[in-house]
């Protein structure tokens, strides 16, 4: 009896997932194929740029393409975020989180 309960519970857990995922692959098989073949690295980057990008510590800068409303070059800059919550313990007293913004450099 216990075995039958486990079998039925697995069936009712897995079956809806198969039903949910299945039609997406049937309707758009070419989209799934494109996603699996998509290159992670930009083919125009040279090896030095790839190594430099991989060695960067922390978060990645955002893509600032079409975010500066016409100025060139639009570049990502890092800035410290200002927290309204006071530090609750001395362990985080020196911690300053940083964020990214897209910015036009001065001419």
Curated annotation (Swiss-Prot):
Q: Which domain of life is it from?
A: Eukaryota
Q: Which residues form a coiled coil?
A: none
Q: Where found? A: Secreted
Q: Which UniProt keywords apply?
A: Developmental protein, Disulfide bond, Secreted, Signal
On whether Disulfide bond is a keyword of this UniProt record, the answer is yes
Concerning InterPro entries, the annotation shows:
EPFL
Disulfide pairings: 64-102, 68-74, 71-104
What's the chief localization of this chain?
A: secreted
Query: Where does the signal peptide begin and end?
Result: 1-24
Listed Pfam families: EPF
Protein name, entry field? EPIDERMAL PATTERNING FACTOR-like protein 3
Gene that this sequence comes from: EPFL3
């Amino acid at each position: 009896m216990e075995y039958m309960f486990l079998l039925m519970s697995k069936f009712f857990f897995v079956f809806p997932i198969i039903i949910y995922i299945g039609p997406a692959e049937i309707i758009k098989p070419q989209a799934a194929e494109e996603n699996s073949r998509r290159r992670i690295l930009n083919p125009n980057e040279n090896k030095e740029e790839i190594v430099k990008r991989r060695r960067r510590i922390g978060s990645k800068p955002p893509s600032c393409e079409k975010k500066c409303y016409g100025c060139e070059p639009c570049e990502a800059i890092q800035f410290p975020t200002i927290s309204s919550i006071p530090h609750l313990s001395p362990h985080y007293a020196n911690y300053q989180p940083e964020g990214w913004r897209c910015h036009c450099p001065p001419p």
